[in-house]
Amino acid sequence: MLARATTHALVGLEPRRVEVEAHLQPGVPGFAIVGLVDRACQEAKHRVRSGVVSAALEWPLNRRITVNLAPAALRKEGSGFDLPISLAVLGATRQLPPEHGV
């Protein structure tokens, strides 16, 4: 299952659009974030999981979660991607209704 969310990263004072794609597939459980991310973004996997569970929502068990932050050439820094990552994961698990045509 695949779900997308859109956010922005600041490059200097310029906002740059970032697409957050969460892909869930059966297999060995894991959580990977790809797309030129710094350490704070890599640690988002722990914050996102804690937030989802704390909100009494279901965390996908027995699934491999891959989150892609695109464009890959743009460096993503900080914890500002936690919410869009959470929304993309929840969308991929169908816990959020899909939205069309934004």
Locations of regions flagged by a protein language model:
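Peripheral, non-AAA+ core regions of ATP-driven protein-machinery
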Residues: 1-102
